[in-house]
């Protein structure tokens, strides 16, 4: 028995000695192993994207600390994309043993990223290269929950609990225009971060401040952005690239990830904006102002779908809504569902919350009574003819107390009409008996009246300004031909468009048209 114990002890000692020797060898050779691993990755990346990636030194300090100096990334025959003077990262040792990367502390100095485009050549073209080998249809299934989980795990893994980033510069230049964002120092202490941000777009300079929290253990992200000296934040690049001018006072955001049933991911959080001003010609010819907007959201992500739960609360000014959205991919075809139901609420909550600049004719309108609203849009792109569209705004004891900027009842008597072309007034004349070309309805042939009615709006006497079936058929046709090919306007809608609205084709005009039509039909103006 003693002999076996002796042999076992000897075997244990030998195994332990070998293990110590191996670990010692790995420790002393860790820099060589690290450089070889990184070198292989760099070589593959260089060959795949046509880059030149260089650094002066890469080494490990201890068992979990990495130092890198003078890194540069230069695309072939392009301007330098990235330079980094020095980087020090301390990783989680136990996570590293399991093959996972979790950054505990990071210090970076003089990180500079430059996106440069001259004519049609850019130093970031490689980012948009198509993959050489496409995955055959049906060979793999998309798992959106898995994708979201991987992205968030990567994000939380690389965002440190503590760290300092000094002199971070990110710039974009196209010909003579440029945007430069500079962070003098970003400090992260016990999951909380704060920093000043200097922004310059061409000759315009701004000074922002950001702060927030990144909590890896709770999978939570919080951030706040505001301008210094009580100025508005003007988001750069968007005006030059998309023609959109967006300004705001403050922006806050939070995100928390949790696990649901059957491998689903639940994302909850809030986003809020104060003092928002938006201009884009496709939205409205005037700047749209939103005093306060907020969303408390709950998003469920599954293997083949993403869903905005109806417990989500959207608030703009006085109005509160609970929308429902779902996008699902079935056999490589999308299926979208959108729904909104709001039970009886004071009518002036809606009309008093309309963003300024979006509905110019209705600004200042005062109403009384109650409203309720139901909306449903269900689109299966595999079966476009099955499309469902329901929209109904009901009223109870509703009345207009005071008109806004425009008298919606002016068509009850003679009024002055101005015709516009390309946004410019071309002619002004009265609509009524005083105009020499005015023709009363009873002087027009009943056959002509019926012909116009049947060709334009056969159900004119039976609806209240809207034909949901006509809108549904028009939307189905547009989806089939993949363009706006058919309209679903009633005569009332065409009348409102010509009398009250301009010819600008934008989202605001269509929404304002619908509201004015409903008011005219409901109040019999």
Task: For the regions a language model picked out, list residue spans one by one.
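Short amphipathic alpha-helical segments
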Residues: 6, 80, 465
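Hydrophobic, Leu/Ile/Phe/Ala-enriched alpha-helical segments that form helix-helix packing faces
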Residues: 42-47, 91, 95, 155, ...
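Short, solvent-exposed loop/hinge segments that bridge or flank secondary-structure elements
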Residues: 171-191
């Amino acid at each position: 028995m003693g002999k076996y114990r002796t042999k076992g002890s000897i075997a244990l000692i030998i195994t332990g000695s070998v293990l110590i020797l191996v670990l010692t060898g790995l420790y002393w050779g860790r820099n060589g192993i690290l450089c070889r691993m990184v070198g292989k990755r760099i070589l593959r990346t260089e060959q795949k994207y046509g880059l030149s990636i260089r650094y002066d030194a890469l080494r490990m300090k201890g068992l979990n600390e990495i130092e890198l100096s003078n890194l540069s990334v230069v695309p072939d025959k392009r301007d330098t994309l990235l330079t980094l003077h020095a980087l020090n990262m301390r990783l989680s040792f136990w996570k590293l043993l399991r093959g996972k990367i979790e950054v505990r502390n990071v210090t970076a100095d003089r990180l500079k990223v430059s996106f440069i485009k001259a004519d049609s050549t850019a130093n970031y073209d490689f980012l948009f290269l198509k993959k050489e080998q496409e995955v055959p249809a049906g060979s793999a299934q998309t798992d959106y929950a898995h994708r979201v989980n991987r992205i968030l795990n990567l994000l939380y893994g690389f965002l440190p609990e503590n760290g300092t980033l000094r002199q971070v510069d990110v710039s974009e230049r196209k010909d003579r225009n440029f945007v430069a964002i500079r962070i003098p120092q970003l400090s992260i202490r016990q999951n909380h971060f704060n920093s000043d941000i200097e922004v310059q777009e061409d000759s315009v300079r701004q000074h922002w401040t950001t702060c927030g929290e990144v909590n890896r253990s709770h999978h939570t992200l919080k951030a706040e952005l505001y301008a210094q000296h009580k100025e508005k934040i003007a988001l750069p690049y968007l005006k030059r690239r998309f023609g959109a001018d967006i300004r705001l006072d403050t922006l806050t955001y939070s995100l928390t990830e949790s696990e649901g049933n059957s491998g689903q991911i639940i994302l909850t959080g809030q986003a809020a904006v104060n003092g928002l001003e938006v201009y884009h010609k496709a939205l409205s010819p005037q700047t749209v102002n939103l005093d306060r907007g907020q969303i408390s959201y709950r998003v469920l992500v599954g293997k083949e779908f993403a869903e905005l739960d109806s417990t989500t609360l959207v608030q703009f000014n006085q109005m509160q809504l609970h929308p429902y959205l779902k996008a699902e991919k079935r056999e490589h075809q999308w299926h979208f569902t959108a729904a909104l139901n709001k039970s009886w609420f004071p009518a002036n909550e809606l009309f008093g919350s309309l963003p300024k600049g979006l509905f110019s004719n209705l600004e200042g309108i005062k109403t009384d009574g109650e409203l309720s609203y139901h909306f449903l849009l269900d689109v299966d792109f595999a079966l476009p003819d099955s499309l469902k569209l329901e929209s109904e705004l009901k009223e109870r004891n509703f009345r207009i107390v005071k008109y806004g900027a425009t008298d919606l009842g002016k068509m009850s008597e003679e009024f002055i009409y101005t015709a516009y072309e390309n946004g410019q007034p071309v002619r002004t004349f009265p609509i009524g008996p005083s105009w020499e070309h005015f023709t009363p309805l009873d002087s027009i042939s009943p056959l002509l009246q019926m012909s116009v009615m049947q060709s334009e709006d056969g159900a004119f006497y039976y609806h209240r300004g809207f034909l949901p079936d006509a809108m549904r058929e028009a939307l189905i046709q547009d989806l089939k031909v993949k363009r706006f090919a058919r309209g679903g306007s009633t005569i009332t809608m065409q009348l409102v468009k010509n009398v009250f609205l301009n010819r600008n084709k934008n989202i605001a005009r269509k929404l304002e048209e619908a509201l004015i039509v409903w008011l005219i039909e409901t109040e019999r103006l």
